[in-house]
Amino acid sequence: MSHRIVAICLLVVFTFFAGVAMSHGHKGTQPAAQESAAPVKASPAEGYNVHVLAPHLVDGKQMGPYHHYCKVIAPDPQIQCLIYDSTEPNANLVQVEWIYAKKLTRSQVPLQEWNKDWHDHKIEIAGGRVQVLDLPPDKAKEVADLVATTDGMIYHFYFGSTLPTGKMSVAQAVGHKPMTSAEYKNYESK
């Protein structure tokens, strides 16, 4: 009797493994893309889901508003935004913005360089041109309050041509005004 139980157990185990092996080789009706799909791994492109709308100055001309899809990279905060000209699935990626805590930028970026290339998000948000979209009002306010503690730098690299031209400029926030040394150093009380 015990030999029979062992034989049945071995048969069940063998059948199980044979079934598993055959199912991996089975083509069935699954599309080829699904058959070869590896487990989904996290990628740098994931997480750009904070949606912000704001116009920018590009070469001195107000343009946009642009759709920013942003992601927090580090809690300082450090934020990156991919910026598109619309919300359409095939929208053009026209800008990238890097956003850093003022305690980082103000301690490392010389004032003259900051006035040329950076902008203060507290001033931009207070100007009323920035909208945090797709979130309830209380969550949108949390995002705006966090971003108000930062400075941003925007690279604009799409000028509406059919193909890239290699032209690039640093865009600015609408309403940006150069700061004095005292204003720049006194960012915490602003």
How should these model regions be labeled?
Residues R4-I5, T15, K27-T29:
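Aromatic-enriched hydrophobic runs in primary sequence
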Residues G28-Y84, E88-K190:
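Primary mode marks residue(s) on the alpha4-beta5-alpha5 output face of response regulator receiver
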